Structure formats: C-alpha cells, structure tokens
Design a protein with these regions (language model features):
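Bacterial N-terminal signal peptides that target proteins for export
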Residues: 1-11
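C-terminal catalytic histidine-bearing segment of alpha/beta-hydrolase fold enzymes
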Residues: 238, 247-253, 258, 266-308
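Bacterial N-terminal signal peptides
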Residues: 10-19
Length: 308
C-alpha cells in the first residue's frame, strides 16, 4: 500500500517503548466511524478525541480534508480548539463536499500547549503513545475505507503550530497529500542535513521526555527523496503581512518573524528542488492587513485549497 510504503521509506523510526498492541494482546479497535451527515460530531478514539463533519451532499469520489489546530489559547483545551476550527470550516465543506477530520492534539500525549518540550510534540510529529502523523493516518485510513478509495490522497491544512505539523507531515508522507495549506507557521523543516529533525533534514537520535516517568527514544533518518517528492505537492504558505512579532530563535530558521521565516523556507525549498532537477510547486502568499489570525486567513486558505 502506498501510504504504508511511504511510512517505511519516509522515516526509519525505532521507538523504544512497549507497544500498545503487543504480542498476545488484543488488537486495537478501529476509530469510530460517523455516517450521519450535516452535523459536527465529537468522537473518542483510543489515542484521543477528534471531530468529524460529513457533508450532506457528497461527491461520487469523497474527498477528505484534515484540519490541524494551533496551540490552544490560555484556559482553552485542545478539544475546544479543534471544535472551533471545524465549525469555522463547515460551510466550506458543504460547498465543496469535503469530509472534515480534526484531531485534538492534547497536552498530555502531544504537548500541544508547549512547543519547547518533547521536541515540539505534535509540531514535530511526535506523540507519547502514537506519533502525531501516525494518528492522523490511522483516522484518515478508517474514513477512506468507509467513504473513499483506500489509496486516495487527502487534503491537509494547518494554522500556526498546526502549520508546523503540515510542513513536517508533507516531507514525511509526500505521496499521501493531494494539496496542502500552511497558515502562519513559526518553524519549518529546513532542507539541509546540517540541522537535525524536526527543524531540518539531519538525523535525530534522542530521548524525548514526556514527563518524569515517561521517556521515548527515537532514531529518525529523513529521506531526501521524500523531501524532493514533497516539492511536487501543491502547497501554499500563507502569512499575514502584519504577522511580524519577533519569535524565539529555533535551529535553522531564517528570520525573526513568521513573515520572513515562511517566505525564506519556501524560497529554500524551491532552490532545493531546482538543485535536484525539479520545479517546486510551493508558493507563498502574503496577505495585507492580516496578522496572526486563523479566522482572518480562512478565506485565503480555502481559496488556496480549491484553486488549481
């Protein structure tokens, strides 16, 4: 299967933890499937909560759009943040027939609130019990089996920390994505082996500490060919012209704010493709009068997802 091959080839990930579905144990149940249309439904999977919206009028070939939320606001849970995202995209899903899946990356298992611990948590595709990218693929596969072709590519959108997830998912699972949009991300995986994952294409061999009692070892070897394949996926990086707050320095990032960091990353990915005989399909759109606002950039994000 294409997605399965991509997981094996995209990264070599060795995880020193006891598997949830180990030898002799019961197999993991499939994620619950929601068939009712026209309503936002909260669903509880073994790895966390996610939200689903099934459009009332579905095309013959169902298209899945995964929305990845940003860092939850103070006093707001990941579940509340994910719910806010999906309700803001319902009209778009109805108009274009997208089935929406919105995972809630909570603090305990995905470090959603703190990007400076657990190697940035879900932003870097990491997770305590299941890696963040693997959870998304688990949910998508289940709904592809129920509503669409199992091998069908899907659409991916993320804002802020969710945009960081999208960038790293893309260079890990390039053949899974039909089109992607990143809105106002602060960091990106740079196309250089001189910077270690999740901030670059260099190898990562590290222990991730989730809490005092839980440590997870990872050995990650990014695959240059998958990164090159990622440059062939249509991707739009959106940043508001007023999104100029100075950010903390992270390895490999070129710039001090989301505006310059995003612009320079696309520029470097285009050059990376050209150096290897390819023409990148990445582009940047700078939106005048907009700051760091998911809702303010939604019309531009939605247009980018539907414009050839």
């Amino acid at each position: 299967m294409a997605l399965y091959r991509q997981i094996l080839l995209g990264f070599i990930i060795l995880v020193s933890v006891v598997a949830l579905a180990g030898c002799g144990s019961e197999p993991l149940p499939q994620p619950p499937l929601i068939h009712e249309s026209g309503q936002v439904t909260q669903v509880d999977d073994v790895f966390g909560t996610f939200y689903v919206y099934v459009p009332t009028s579905m095309p013959k070939q169902q298209q899945i759009l995964v929305l990845v939320h940003g860092t939850p606001a103070k006093e707001e849970s990941a579940e509340e943040t994910a719910h806010y995202y999906i309700v803001n995209w319902v009209d778009f899903a109805e108009e274009h027939g997208y089935l929406l899946i919105v995972p809630a990356f909570n603090q305990e298992n995905f470090s959603s609130r703190y990007g400076d611990i657990a190697l940035s948590g879900y932003r870097g595709l990491f997770g305590r019990e299941i890696n963040a990218d693997e959870w998304v693929l688990r949910l998508v596969r289940a709904y592809q089996q129920a509503f669409a072709a199992p091998e069908e590519q899907f659409y991916l959108y993320g804002h802020s920390a969710g945009g960081q997830f999208v960038a790293r998912f893309l260079v890990t699972h390039a053949d899974a994505i039909k089109r992607a949009v990143i809105s106002s991300a602060a960091t990106y995986p740079q196309p250089t082996t001189g910077v270690a994952w999740p901030f670059g294409m260099g190898e990562l061999h590290a222990d991730i500490e989730w809490d005092a009692a839980t440590s997870k070892h990872v050995d990650i070897i990014p695959d240059k060919q998958v990164w090159l394949a990622a440059t062939q996926v249509p991707l739009t990086v959106l940043v508001g012209l007023n999104d100029t707050d100075e950010l903390s320095g992270y390895p490999g990032q070129k710039g001090k704010n989301r505006f310059t960091i995003g612009h320079n990353w696309v520029k470097d990915m285009v050059a990376f493709a050209q150096e290897n005989g390819l023409e990148s399909r990445f582009k940047t759109e700078i939106i005048p009068g907009k700051g760091h606002s998911m809702s303010g950039l939604i019309p531009y994000s939605q247009q980018a997802l539907t414009t050839p």
